[in-house]
């Protein structure tokens, strides 16, 4: 299982609106095109947005290819009032919002 963590800023009180955008999008074809198995959205502290994507493979290349897809553009446009780049000076595209995992541990099956 691959985990991708997207980090951004979110407007105060926007969690229900953001969740609605994704609930509607997740009922369409976009999660299947990207390869999303599970999505979790988190808010941390004063306006930090965390978006965890769980998938079989790294979704970054597919997300990069789908930025022009009508459903991807629609989600992005609907999120604009609520979500913004964590660091606007360095953001050029979706990959720039993806955190780099530097440690992972998994329990081995007992046996």
UniProtKB/Swiss-Prot annotation:
It comes from Streptomyces coelicolor (strain ATCC BAA-471 / A3(2) / M145). This is Uncharacterized protein SCO5314. One of its GO terms (biological process) is polyketide biosynthetic process.
